[in-house]
Amino acid sequence: MGRSESQMDITDINAPKPKKKQRWTPLEISLSVLVLLLTIIAVTMIALYATYDDGICKSSDCIKSAARLIQNMDASAEPCTDFFKYACGGWLKRNVIPETSSRYSNFDILRDELEVILKDVLQEPKTEDIVAVQKAKTLYRSCINESAIDSRGGQPLLTLLPDIYGWPVASQNWEQTYGTSWTAEKSIAQLNSKYGKKVLINFFVGTDDKNSTQHIIHFDQPRLGLPSRDYYECTGIYKEACTAYVDFMISVARLIRQEQRLPIDENQLSLEMNKVMELEKEIANATTKPEDRNDPMLLYNKMTLAKLQNNFSLEINGKPFSWSNFTNEIMSTVNINIQNEEEVVVYAPEYLTKLKPILTKYSPRDLQNLMSWRFIMDLVSSLSRNYKESRNAFRKALYGTTSETATWRRCANYVNGNMENAVGRLYVEAAFAGESKHVVEDLIAQIREVFIQTLDDLTWMDAETKKKAEEKALAIKERIGYPDDIISNENKLNNEYLELNYKEEEYFENIIQNLKFSQSKQLKKLREKVDKDEWISGAAVVNAFYSSGRNQIVFPAGILQPPFFSARQSNSLNYGGIGMVIGHEITHGFDDNGRNFNKDGDLVDWWTQQSANNFKDQSQCMVYQYGNFTWDLAGGQHLNGINTLGENIADNGGIGQAYRAYQNYVKKNGEEKLLPGLDLNHKQLFFLNFAQVWCGTYRPEYAVNSIKTDVHSPGNFRIIGTLQNSAEFADAFHCRKNSYMNPERKCRVW
């Protein structure tokens, strides 16, 4: 072998020799065959590997989804012991609540990201902007113009005060200036009709619950200066908030007196503001608790204005209160005359009865101090820095935040809240994928079908009521993404804001203009038909909605993004995300409130007595379940199972419907490829993505606030409560019976 190779090599490098035909040796033939075989094997292996499907999705979208899920979860936690920790443990380790936020969650992160988009589109000058968009950008610039706002101090507010009968504590000789012309009817009405501020009496024009095509006047109990009536106990966990509230009043009164160069008597300021607190405590105690206001049938009390006067007589400053004069003071601002035969709806008869003895105890000065304060406290954040800073301790007591929200964020939200269609146009053009609309339409159709099919499973509901429920489900109208008109009909959009004209240097006046505009628009509706095609939300919103009076579900563009939805992410994630949200909103039509409205949106009892009784029995299971959860962040308080019932019913119904819809999808289309890096099947991924939507935490101060004011359960209990009731979840994660996440007793309504 060596000799032959040497000859070949030598031949190659030495002088040529006479040619003669050479034969391959057996060894050379063997080697050649071996090389050929190895080449064939290598090519075959490469071809097989290139086409080999290991069942793992390797697209960039799958990799992103997997990375997000892995980052958020704590795989070392036991899913059957605490699924919140399992799903969100990683998120909790990585995220800290910002100093400006009272809570932080995946929802809030999406909202933060949306606000960045709004900032970018609102601050970008474009010569081709339509008039409505130009106005939105002017309003935004006026809001972020801190130098102009600071240079004006409290002067814009001082200019406004005479229009609302002043603020006695911050005035000199109030009785002589306003006392002779002051009447309770005029003072309460002025705040309402011009600025939409409802103090002492909540008067508003809204849809008639029993005739949802018409508007009607409503009388209700007012909102309070503190988050809920419980705060006015002013002891224990509420003590700091009460102290900060009174100090806030005193600080603002002091600033206004200083600005007017009036003498300051600290004792007098303290005396008057503590009197306001006493009055507001009595009003708070007169209001009905939220858990006693959950039945819309009991809330609805229709009567004539004359009967209202007869049933609920009030006396202020020794004079009888005229409900007719009060009503006409408000409605005359939009040129509508109200006769005593006008029908109105009273939502709070108990409150109006209890209000009478309270009002007789207080002077016009006391009442005006309260009314003006409640308006002023809303406007403080629109004034110069020293006014804003007077709110710091109060904000900390209620929300736990040590810093104000960044100006640009606050302003982007303010403009979006007041010009939602103009801002929605900008957001949709910048960030919304139009093809999402059709995919979500299909998801809604699937989940609606599942809801109707599952009616057959309900043993507690009779056939007659099931038939009506099916009719209502089929009649639900959906709104997805945004109203087409905000893009296609520029004239309509411009006309919507025709009356508004903003100035960059006058942010405060712009705010007042918005208050007047929105209140006037609402009052004018009294003699107009309800526009049931009107959207109940703007497009640039990370949320979803159900309207009982319209029987309408709405999914704004802002929520149609991961983790809720993407046309390019696994369908298990879409069904666990936006699918669950769709089911949640559909179920709202049949929760403890929505079930009282028929397919046309009218407050009508369409239930048989037996089915209604059974519904209450089924619901009671969830009242107990959620009411037994204690929240450490809120000082160990129990959740309110009654106030959160509607949302809990919707969560439980939504997850069940979405899961069954996903099972139908798999039967039709086959199993999806698994996600890389996760040892989880798609049933498990469905529940994991659902849970991660609610990853988040609260500051203790806001937990105390939220447990009394939010109709939603905190995120961790939305996960735990819903999945404890899901046999499908227990099956997917192989949870043994009677483990924490798989209790023997499960609650189900829908």
UniProtKB/Swiss-Prot annotation:
Cofactor: Zn(2+)
Example of a GO cellular component annotation carried by this entry: extracellular region
Gene Ontology molecular function: any one: exopeptidase activity
Active site: E585, D651 (proton donor)
Ranges facing Extracellular side: 52-750
A single BP term in Gene Ontology: creatinine metabolic process
Chain ranges on the Cytoplasmic side, renumbered to this chain: 2-28
Cysteine pairings via disulfide bonds: C57-C62, C80-C735, C88-C695, C143-C411, C234-C242, C621-C747
Regions crossing the membrane: 29-51
Lipid-modified residues, N-myristoyl glycine kind: G2
Positions annotated with a glycan in the UniProt record: N145, N211, N285, N311, N325, N628
Short sequence motif Stop-transfer sequence: positions: 16-23
Domain of life: Eukaryota
Annotated function: Thermolysin-like specificity, but is almost confined on acting on polypeptides of up to 30 amino acids. Biologically important in the destruction of opioid peptides such as Met- and Leu-enkephalins by cleavage of a Gly-Phe bond. Catalyzes cleavage of bradykinin, substance P and neurotensin peptides. Able to cleave angiotensin-1, angiotensin-2 and angiotensin 1-9. Involved in the degradation of the atrial natriuretic factor (ANF). Displays UV-inducible elastase activity toward skin preelastic and elastic fibers.
Membership in a protein family: Belongs to the peptidase M13 family.
Protein name: Neprilysin
